[in-house]
């Protein structure tokens, strides 16, 4: 079902759209940084390690990530994180890959054409729709985007992911992480940018 809405009469103060959380908050400035002493320093320096550890701790607390889950900060934003996970973990089992917008389609392309996973089932839907989630297997790895930034379509919840699954769930949660409740117990690898 496609719903056509009226064009809004009220525009945002900053009407430039970009996918993901790219824009700084109103009033943000470099002057808000606690310290410039970390600029140009190695991430291995003690001061930078302290900042990184603080950010990781706050991220877990803010998002209610279970205590036994690991959080890491990696280069390359969400794309870097998702690619690292795919390239190092996907493949021994069959793969169910879902796509209904730009980012999910990109992950499907990588799995099919770069990683060349042979036992791949692609669940694709047109923009504005979502694939039939009841077709996802219990004995497969699952690759999906929780909320399709470019299409505005999201999975309703994680009920379609079996608690008895044998595979790994790879979830691109960039546009969902701070706005929707995620079922962490069903998400093995969850990536996002901020």
Name each model feature, range by range.
Residues 18, 73, 191-192:
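Structural signal for conserved beta-strand scaffold positions within catalytic alpha/beta enzyme cores
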Residues 31-34, 55-59, 131, 165-171:
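A broad, low-specificity signal for short, low-complexity segments enriched in glycine/proline
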Residues 19-22, 48, 143, 171:
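Generic recognition of cysteine residues
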Residues 1-46:
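N-terminal "arm"/small-domain region of PLP-dependent enzymes with the aminotransferase-like
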Residues 81-194:
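Conserved PLP-enzyme active-site core in the AAT-like
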Residues 8, 62-65, 115:
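Short, conserved catalytic or adaptor-binding loops enriched in Gly and charged residues
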Residues 32-84, 88, 100-110:
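Conserved N-terminal alpha-helix of the aminotransferase class I/II PLP-enzyme fold
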Residues 12-14, 69, 139:
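Sequence-level motif detector for i,i+2 pairs with an aromatic at +2
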């Amino acid at each position: 079902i496609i719903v056509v809405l009226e064009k809004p009469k009220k525009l945002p103060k900053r009407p430039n759209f970009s996918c993901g959380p790219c824009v700084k908050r109103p009033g943000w400035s470099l002057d808000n940084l606690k310290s410039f002493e970390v600029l140009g320093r190695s991430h291995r320096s003690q001061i930078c390690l302290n900042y990184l550890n603080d950010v990781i701790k706050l991220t877990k607390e803010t998002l209610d990530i279970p205590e036994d889950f690991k959080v890491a900060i990696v280069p390359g934003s969400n794309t870097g994180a998702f690619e690292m996970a795919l390239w190092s973990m996907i493949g021994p089992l069959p793969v169910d890959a879902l796509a209904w917008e730009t980012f999910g389609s990109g992950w499907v392309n990588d799995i099919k054409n770069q990683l060349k996973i042979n036992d791949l089932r692609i669940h694709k839907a047109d923009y504005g729709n979502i694939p039939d989630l009841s077709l996802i297997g219990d004995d497969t790895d699952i690759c999906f985007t929780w909320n399709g930034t470019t299409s505005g379509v999201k999975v309703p919840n994680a009920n379609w992911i079996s608690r008895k699954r044998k595979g790994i769930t790879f979830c691109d949660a960039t546009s969902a992480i701070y706005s929707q409740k995620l079922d962490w117990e069903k998400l093995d690898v969850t990536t996002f940018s901020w």
